[in-house]
């Protein structure tokens, strides 16, 4: 975006090229400025007078009000010389004394845009012709070579003390680079994701001007800004009465600036003094060589005030006065007419790459949010180090206007450059919005006069730059030699109301002058009170010029005005001094290309950084080559206009702002001081809540909105009073002589006059007839830069330029610091259940867990079934010895008896210790999304992202709140001498002022005829961007974000309930040998042995006697036949018990010896294969054992439904097929019969008991249901993509299992062949897996999409498997 000074440069260049075709200067001597006269009545239009001689220079007139907005860009495109009006020069009127400034004229209509002309060959300098009327703007020619520096002029006498001037504008900018061709505007990009605000980058190049925004409400009155570019000349207003001239005080040394006084009221008009006779005007001679500088003459006594002359050149700026207090805001000014659309400029070169920030971890990008309301203005970044100049790049395309940057830091004042060439008057620019008030700056040194710059092509109007720091007051320079009478300057804007000064001493009453003829309508006055918008009236006819009043106080230098109407040719005069270059002659044939200008030093191309805030212009530098194309910056919102501040020294270039949105049209306000800022607009309505997406990194601020639409035009306010003049400053040193510029291409030879001898300068004669225009001569010496006039009123926005293609992207900045962690996003939708994987291998048995804490005692269960007989008890204590029985004969062993009946159930054993923890069950389905958590803490700042594409324009934002009043800055340095302003209308005669010092006697001129009404002014430059628009409406909800990552594992759950008692263990190893048993009874007597050998004959025995035969026969088993059956019975009982124990430990899965679950069978017989086996989950009697399928691969126990297949047919016809609802198959369609499981000889109650035990013994269950369909949706409807027609399943504990909702109660689908109605059979396999076995088996199903005559379905109930 162009800064204010850029705009001035462009305007000066444009005016230079324009003035080259019509320029006529008048000689004037600086007289004392008289007070401003009152507004006189409108005179009738008088006849043209005879040509008069040039009068002496009058004092500079005060700045006039702003003219209409001028055109920016190249002007010759629509200029057809054949259609131009015949601007013949009129006869020159008598030079009257200087008149008081006229009132402001209304803004002229916008002119047309011209096409660029080719540069002509430079010709010899022809005689200076009369100034022609303003032509349409021509296209900027190629830059000419700098002219040779002129000789220093004679030093003039010190002028009287001038009035205190308004703050001066910044000095001329340095040489402007050659302007590239305008490119087309690029298409506006989509809004990028907002990044966090990066660190301030190095100042970037000035951006191209943004599209004008609509006029916003008036902001708070800003500081006094630098005067804006001159507006086009308005229609002459009626002349006001002339006030009396105050007495001239002796010029004192410049004092310190006093406190600002209040602005005084307009003094009464002084009487018109007598007009001196005009001598005949001689023909314009060839320029004579400049004479030596004479010593300043003593001031003569004050002469009687002369009649009011036409407005003279702007006087040398007086010492800047102290800034007055901030005036109250005036009503809004009317909107100016729209300017023609400017040619698209090329983008500027890319700015230097900003310093990279610390690299952070990149955050995940969030979806682009809706444009947010404009954020508060960021802190001002520090100025970056200036980069060295880059090599010339190709011309860039014009970028989208950037938003206004922050004011840059103040630079130090440069030394005064040598005098530059007088630039051509540029077209009147539109009044830009006031820039932000700058901070007061350090006083800068007065720089030397700069070298003459080459005229650049007029660029598009830029936004007014931020106000720089006011410089210290410079010393007043010596009064220069009187120049030729210049064209009247444009009437400048009314400055803000200054502080009220002390009333001046009343002047002596002068004689009443003759009433002049009726003057032309005066320009618009200052703002009056706000009236209702009236209908624009027709412009009044221009009145006759009244007699001139006495000179008024010195006013601000007016901005360079457009060329005035041509005067009538005068007779040939004496040879004058070397004149300024004459107007351009008729277009010659295309000349040879001139030598190239000096190329600036090539610097390394810096990486592109973010644009810095626009700084004020620096001194004019040498023209550089066209830089590389910059990327179009997004348009930013215009800032709230501040008071016009004093021009500051250049700051660093600010960042380019994001594009603003176009605001609604506001009512046009009246011109005047800035109003108070409007309140910040209400935020836009909130959008509906979207599904919470995963938290992304913090987005950057959204693009700012555009300025609001201008309001209706108010009526002009009354003219404000003029301030008193301040004391003059000390004389400044003359500038150094400029270097000789390169010679321009040779023009066609014009008619050359004979060179006369260098004589004393005679009085100028009247203007001679215009000779044929000579070709363009060498550039004359530059004139002093005049104060720029105040900025013109803001015109309505011109049409948007064609969007240029985006420039090359700058290099990405370094990553910024990592952003803070965003809020946790909502849980994503649970994915569909995958198909069951192959069964895993059985895990090894884990170590036993520690015993859990004992649970509270449960309620007593129902009486259990009689238990199996207990193990044989220990032997009882030994009975007393019975009587010996009679020995029977030994019988044969009897056969083994049948097993006795089972013994009575023994008492329940103690509760076994808890078994080992079972294997972990399969993971449950994802839970439903939890409630939104509290927002996380702010994350660390994210890395600075690359510049996003420009966002779409959002709706207009509401006008921001007005900023506080800025402090008035100190007065600025005096500006260089401005171009001569246009001649103001002659006011009525004022009262005679006190006698002025005697001036040199001028030749008496003849009375001139009033000039014709001026032509329309040039169109204004394109306006600046409007204020930020209201926040846009909330965007549509974004798509649901992707599911979040799995969360961290939850805390360890509490210990589960004690598991069921484990299975009986296998047989243990044999125990140790027990202690010796009780000694057994004696065994029975064995059979008699064989006879022994005969013994020797014994001795003769004594007398024989008897012996006792009895012994302990009861101690020996089986010797006594009566005891043997008892032994066999014991043996059989032992064997039976052993078998029973063995069957308990290793069940066979038969009906007589069922296992508790299939898992027990697999553990007991790992070598067995899967198949159907009998199980008895509730143990006890085997009569209620059930047949189940054992899958030894997975350890699952699967129980089949009694009726597995339900035939396919039309089960249900609805009376109202459109009224769809879920219909339970078992409960409603099938007569209340739910699905049953395993009916082989087991009652429903027994089966329910077995299933209950089975659920207790398992920690995981699963079941599949196959839904056969024809024209019936089972799960997803392919037409709508949703699950609203899915079936519902009823679990065992009356829980309803659905296709969507809480993830714990949702089933999944392995195959979905029932998603469309195509008159074909399909099937959908539904699977439900859970670690809550109490929910299975499935007892019923409720389809929704049934009831039509063509809708059929059937079912296959898969087995329920527990594990």
Curated annotation (Swiss-Prot):
The modification Allysine is found at residue 83. Forms the fibrils of tendon, ligaments and bones. In bones the fibrils are mineralized with calcium hydroxyapatite. The modification 4-hydroxyproline is found at residues 440, 443. It is found in: Secreted, Extracellular space, Extracellular matrix. GO terms for molecular function: extracellular matrix structural constituent conferring tensile strength; metal ion binding. The modification 5-hydroxylysine is found at residue 176. PROSITE patterns: NC1_FIB. Disulfide bonds join 1158-1190, 1198-1361, 1269-1314. Residues 23-77, 1118-1363 form a propeptide. Keywords: Calcium, Collagen, Disulfide bond, Extracellular matrix, Glycoprotein, Hydroxylation, Metal-binding, Pyrrolidone carboxylic acid, Repeat, Secreted, Signal. Gene3D superfamilies: 2.60.120.1000. Trimers of one alpha 2(I) and two alpha 1(I) chains. This is Collagen alpha-2(I) chain. It comes from Gallus gallus (Chicken).
